[in-house]
C-alpha cells in the first residue's frame, strides 16, 4: 500500500471499533472494543486485523496479489533443499471480499518459512529479492580452503528503496 501511494503510514488514519463485517463474517481485533482512532503505523504496531483489512481494500485484490507473486509467495524459492513446497495462495479469480480481507492480514494464505524469510529480507534489503540458500560455502576441513561457494543470486526488485526505508522504520517501531 505504501509503494502504491494509497496510504501514508503516519498521516492516514483508521478507526478500529473492534471488528469489521466482511461478506457476513465478523473479523475481530485481538483487543476487545478495538483500538479506536489510529494511524496506519499504529495499526501495524498493534497488529489490528480490521485496520489491515482496510489496507487490503485500499490496495485491491489485483495489486495485493501481484505483490504476493512479486515477493515469491505461491512459488518455490529454489532453495537448495529437497521437498520445498510452493505454499497455497487463492487463485485471483476465486478471490472475493472475504478472501481479500483474510489474505491482507495473513490468514488467507499458506506460506513456507523460507518464503517468509525471503520476502522480509527483500523488504529490508532495499527491495532486492535474492534466492535463498542454506550453505554459503564448503570448506576443506584440514586446510580450511573453499571447495565450493555460492554467490548471491539476485532475483528481482520488489519495492523501491524509499518504501523499504519506510517499512524498516515501521518494523522497528513494532519492537
For the regions a protein language model found, what residue spans apply to each?
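Beta-lactam-recognizing serine transpeptidase/beta-lactamase-like catalytic domain environment
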Residues: 2-175
Amino acid at each position: 500500500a505504501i509503494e502504491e501511494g494509497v496510504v501514508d503510514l503516519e498521516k492516514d488514519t483508521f478507526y478500529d471499533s473492534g471488528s469489521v463485517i466482511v461478506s457476513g463474517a465478523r473479523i475481530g481485533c485481538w483487543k476487545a472494543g478495538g483500538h479506536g482512532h489510529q494511524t496506519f503505523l499504529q495499526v501495524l504496531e498493534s497488529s489490528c486485523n480490521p485496520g489491515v483489512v482496510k489496507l487490503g481494500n485500499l490496495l485491491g485484490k489485483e495489486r495485493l496479489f501481484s505483490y504476493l507473486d512479486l515477493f515469491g509467495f505461491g512459488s518455490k524459492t529454489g532453495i537448495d533443499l529437497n521437498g520445498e513446497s510452493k505454499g497455497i495462495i487463492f487463485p485471483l479469480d476465486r478471490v472475493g471480499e472475504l478472501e481479500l480481507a483474510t489474505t491482507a492480514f495473513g490468514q488467507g494464505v499458506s506460506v513456507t518459512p523460507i518464503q517468509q524469510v525471503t520476502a522480509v529480507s527483500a523488504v529490508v534489503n532495499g527491495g532486492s529479492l535474492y534466492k535463498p540458500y542454506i550453505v554459503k560455502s564448503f570448506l576443506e576441513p584440514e586446510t580450511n580452503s573453499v571447495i565450493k561457494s555460492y554467490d548471491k543470486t539476485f532475483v528481482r526488485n520488489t519495492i523501491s528503496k524509499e518504501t523499504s526505508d519506510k517499512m524498516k522504520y515501521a518494523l522497528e517501531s513494532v519492537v
